[in-house]
Amino acid sequence: MAATGINSEDRLVQATFAAHLKDKLGWDTVYAFNAETFGADGTLGRNDTTEAVLTRDVRAALRRLNPELPTPAIDDALRALTLHDFSRSLLQHNQEFARLIRNGIPVSWRDANGQRRDARARVIDFDNARDANRFLAVRELKLTGLPTPNYNRRADLVCFVNGLPLVFIELKAVYKNIRAGFDGNLRDYMDENVVAQAFHHNVFLIVSNGDRAKY
Protein backbone atom coordinates (compact mmCIF):
# COMPACT_ATOMS: atom_id res chain seq x y z
CA MET A 1 0.00 0.00 0.00
CA ALA A 2 1.37 3.41 -0.90
CA ALA A 3 1.76 6.03 1.79
CA THR A 4 -1.82 7.30 1.64
CA GLY A 5 -4.91 7.01 3.84
CA ILE A 6 -5.93 3.50 4.80
CA ASN A 7 -9.39 2.30 3.81
CA SER A 8 -11.18 1.07 6.94
CA GLU A 9 -12.17 -2.20 5.27
CA ASP A 10 -8.59 -2.76 4.13
CA ARG A 11 -7.53 -2.23 7.74
CA LEU A 12 -10.15 -4.71 8.97
CA VAL A 13 -8.74 -7.42 6.70
CA GLN A 14 -5.24 -6.54 7.84
CA ALA A 15 -6.17 -6.67 11.53
CA THR A 16 -7.91 -10.03 11.02
CA PHE A 17 -4.81 -11.51 9.40
CA ALA A 18 -2.57 -10.22 12.18
CA ALA A 19 -4.93 -11.54 14.86
CA HIS A 20 -4.88 -15.01 13.26
CA LEU A 21 -1.08 -15.03 13.22
CA LYS A 22 -1.01 -14.02 16.88
CA ASP A 23 -3.89 -16.03 18.34
CA LYS A 24 -3.69 -19.19 16.24
CA LEU A 25 -0.03 -19.44 15.28
CA GLY A 26 1.69 -17.73 18.20
CA TRP A 27 3.37 -14.90 16.30
CA ASP A 28 4.27 -11.61 17.92
CA THR A 29 2.58 -8.66 16.21
CA VAL A 30 3.37 -4.94 16.03
CA TYR A 31 1.46 -2.05 14.49
CA ALA A 32 4.22 0.26 13.23
CA PHE A 33 2.66 3.12 11.27
CA ASN A 34 3.13 6.43 13.11
CA ALA A 35 4.01 4.38 16.19
CA GLU A 36 7.49 3.05 15.44
CA THR A 37 10.43 4.54 17.31
CA PHE A 38 13.91 4.19 15.87
CA GLY A 39 17.34 3.26 17.21
CA ALA A 40 18.82 0.21 18.91
CA ASP A 41 16.17 0.31 21.65
CA GLY A 42 13.33 1.33 19.34
CA THR A 43 10.21 -0.60 18.40
CA LEU A 44 11.93 -2.83 15.83
CA GLY A 45 15.55 -1.84 16.30
CA ARG A 46 15.70 -0.10 12.92
CA ASN A 47 17.84 3.00 12.46
CA ASP A 48 15.61 4.34 9.70
CA THR A 49 12.99 3.32 7.15
CA THR A 50 15.49 2.17 4.51
CA GLU A 51 16.17 -0.92 6.64
CA ALA A 52 14.07 -3.91 5.61
CA VAL A 53 15.96 -6.36 7.84
CA LEU A 54 15.55 -6.18 11.61
CA THR A 55 19.22 -6.45 12.48
CA ARG A 56 18.60 -6.52 16.23
CA ASP A 57 16.62 -9.74 15.87
CA VAL A 58 19.06 -11.20 13.33
CA ARG A 59 22.01 -10.63 15.66
CA ALA A 60 20.11 -12.15 18.59
CA ALA A 61 19.30 -15.23 16.50
CA LEU A 62 22.90 -15.63 15.33
CA ARG A 63 24.11 -15.51 18.92
CA ARG A 64 21.40 -17.87 20.16
CA LEU A 65 21.86 -20.47 17.42
CA ASN A 66 25.67 -20.29 17.25
CA PRO A 67 26.90 -19.96 20.86
CA GLU A 68 30.34 -21.22 19.88
CA LEU A 69 31.04 -18.31 17.52
CA PRO A 70 33.02 -15.26 18.70
CA THR A 71 31.62 -11.76 18.22
CA PRO A 72 33.69 -10.98 15.08
CA ALA A 73 32.24 -14.05 13.35
CA ILE A 74 28.71 -13.01 14.36
CA ASP A 75 29.40 -9.54 12.96
CA ASP A 76 30.63 -11.03 9.66
CA ALA A 77 27.53 -13.22 9.37
CA LEU A 78 25.26 -10.24 9.98
CA ARG A 79 27.05 -8.20 7.31
CA ALA A 80 26.71 -11.04 4.82
CA LEU A 81 22.97 -11.24 5.46
CA THR A 82 22.40 -7.51 5.01
CA LEU A 83 24.79 -6.68 2.17
CA HIS A 84 23.19 -4.59 -0.58
CA ASP A 85 25.05 -4.54 -3.89
CA PHE A 86 23.64 -1.94 -6.28
CA SER A 87 25.16 -3.82 -9.23
CA ARG A 88 23.00 -6.90 -8.52
CA SER A 89 19.33 -7.42 -9.24
CA LEU A 90 16.57 -8.27 -6.80
CA LEU A 91 16.61 -11.86 -8.10
CA GLN A 92 20.37 -12.19 -7.64
CA HIS A 93 20.13 -10.90 -4.08
CA ASN A 94 17.24 -13.26 -3.35
CA GLN A 95 19.06 -16.31 -4.69
CA GLU A 96 22.20 -15.55 -2.69
CA PHE A 97 20.35 -14.89 0.57
CA ALA A 98 18.28 -18.06 0.09
CA ARG A 99 21.50 -20.07 -0.07
CA LEU A 100 22.84 -18.44 3.09
CA ILE A 101 19.60 -18.99 4.98
CA ARG A 102 19.37 -22.61 3.88
CA ASN A 103 23.03 -23.66 4.08
CA GLY A 104 24.42 -21.29 6.71
CA ILE A 105 26.71 -18.27 6.40
CA PRO A 106 30.42 -19.10 5.96
CA VAL A 107 32.51 -17.41 8.66
CA SER A 108 36.12 -17.70 9.82
CA TRP A 109 38.14 -16.44 12.79
CA ARG A 110 41.36 -17.04 14.69
CA ASP A 111 41.19 -18.94 17.95
CA ALA A 112 43.27 -18.24 21.07
CA ASN A 113 46.19 -20.15 19.54
CA GLY A 114 46.08 -18.19 16.31
CA GLN A 115 44.62 -21.09 14.37
CA ARG A 116 42.08 -20.35 11.66
CA ARG A 117 38.63 -21.74 12.39
CA ASP A 118 35.84 -22.08 9.83
CA ALA A 119 32.13 -22.64 10.37
CA ARG A 120 28.71 -21.96 8.97
CA ALA A 121 26.49 -19.74 11.07
CA ARG A 122 22.81 -20.63 11.27
CA VAL A 123 20.25 -17.86 11.23
CA ILE A 124 17.13 -20.06 11.33
CA ASP A 125 16.66 -23.32 13.23
CA PHE A 126 14.78 -25.59 10.84
CA ASP A 127 14.79 -28.56 13.22
CA ASN A 128 13.15 -26.84 16.19
CA ALA A 129 11.32 -24.12 14.30
CA ARG A 130 8.53 -23.29 16.73
CA ASP A 131 10.64 -22.92 19.86
CA ALA A 132 14.01 -21.73 18.55
CA ASN A 133 12.98 -18.90 16.23
CA ARG A 134 11.24 -15.56 16.66
CA PHE A 135 8.17 -14.96 14.49
CA LEU A 136 7.09 -11.33 14.17
CA ALA A 137 4.33 -9.84 11.99
CA VAL A 138 4.55 -6.08 11.45
CA ARG A 139 1.54 -4.13 10.20
CA GLU A 140 1.93 -0.92 8.20
CA LEU A 141 5.72 -1.01 7.95
CA LYS A 142 7.08 2.14 6.34
CA LEU A 143 9.87 1.55 3.83
CA THR A 144 12.04 4.01 1.93
CA GLY A 145 13.96 3.28 -1.26
CA LEU A 146 17.74 2.91 -1.13
CA PRO A 147 18.65 4.27 -4.59
CA THR A 148 15.84 6.84 -4.50
CA PRO A 149 15.18 7.97 -0.91
CA ASN A 150 12.13 10.02 -1.85
CA TYR A 151 10.23 6.80 -2.66
CA ASN A 152 8.22 5.88 0.44
CA ARG A 153 5.92 2.89 0.69
CA ARG A 154 3.88 1.33 3.48
CA ALA A 155 3.68 -2.45 3.54
CA ASP A 156 0.41 -3.93 4.80
CA LEU A 157 1.89 -6.92 6.62
CA VAL A 158 5.48 -8.15 6.67
CA CYS A 159 6.31 -11.40 8.45
CA PHE A 160 9.80 -11.69 9.89
CA VAL A 161 11.55 -14.85 11.04
CA ASN A 162 14.51 -13.99 13.25
CA GLY A 163 14.50 -10.50 11.76
CA LEU A 164 14.46 -11.57 8.10
CA PRO A 165 11.46 -10.41 6.01
CA LEU A 166 10.45 -13.78 4.57
CA VAL A 167 6.75 -13.14 3.87
CA PHE A 168 5.21 -10.02 2.31
CA ILE A 169 1.41 -9.79 2.41
CA GLU A 170 -0.63 -7.25 0.45
CA LEU A 171 -4.21 -6.98 1.71
CA LYS A 172 -7.31 -5.54 0.11
CA ALA A 173 -10.90 -5.00 1.22
CA VAL A 174 -13.13 -8.04 0.70
CA TYR A 175 -14.97 -6.48 -2.26
CA LYS A 176 -11.74 -5.77 -4.19
CA ASN A 177 -10.13 -7.97 -6.85
CA ILE A 178 -6.94 -9.41 -5.39
CA ARG A 179 -5.23 -9.17 -8.78
CA ALA A 180 -5.10 -5.42 -8.23
CA GLY A 181 -2.98 -5.99 -5.15
CA PHE A 182 -0.29 -7.59 -7.28
CA ASP A 183 -0.49 -5.39 -10.36
CA GLY A 184 -1.04 -2.14 -8.51
CA ASN A 185 1.14 -2.60 -5.44
CA LEU A 186 3.61 -5.49 -5.39
CA ARG A 187 4.99 -4.80 -8.87
CA ASP A 188 5.60 -1.23 -7.80
CA TYR A 189 7.32 -2.23 -4.55
CA MET A 190 9.66 -4.66 -6.32
CA ASP A 191 10.93 -2.05 -8.77
CA GLU A 192 14.69 -1.69 -8.28
CA ASN A 193 14.20 2.06 -7.80
CA VAL A 194 11.50 1.72 -5.15
CA VAL A 195 11.79 -0.66 -2.15
CA ALA A 196 13.24 -3.78 -3.77
CA GLN A 197 15.41 -4.38 -0.69
CA ALA A 198 12.28 -5.53 1.13
CA PHE A 199 12.22 -8.60 -1.14
CA HIS A 200 15.87 -9.64 -1.04
CA HIS A 201 15.10 -12.34 1.55
CA ASN A 202 11.52 -13.02 0.47
CA VAL A 203 10.13 -16.55 0.34
CA PHE A 204 6.39 -15.91 -0.06
CA LEU A 205 4.38 -13.10 -1.66
CA ILE A 206 0.71 -13.22 -0.69
CA VAL A 207 -2.21 -11.11 -1.89
CA SER A 208 -5.59 -11.49 -0.19
CA ASN A 209 -8.90 -9.73 0.33
CA GLY A 210 -9.80 -11.82 3.37
CA ASP A 211 -11.94 -14.15 1.27
CA ARG A 212 -9.50 -15.28 -1.39
CA ALA A 213 -5.73 -15.39 -1.48
CA LYS A 214 -2.98 -15.97 -4.03
CA TYR A 215 0.69 -16.63 -3.41
Predicted feature locations:
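An alpha-helical interface "stripe"
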Residues: 1-215
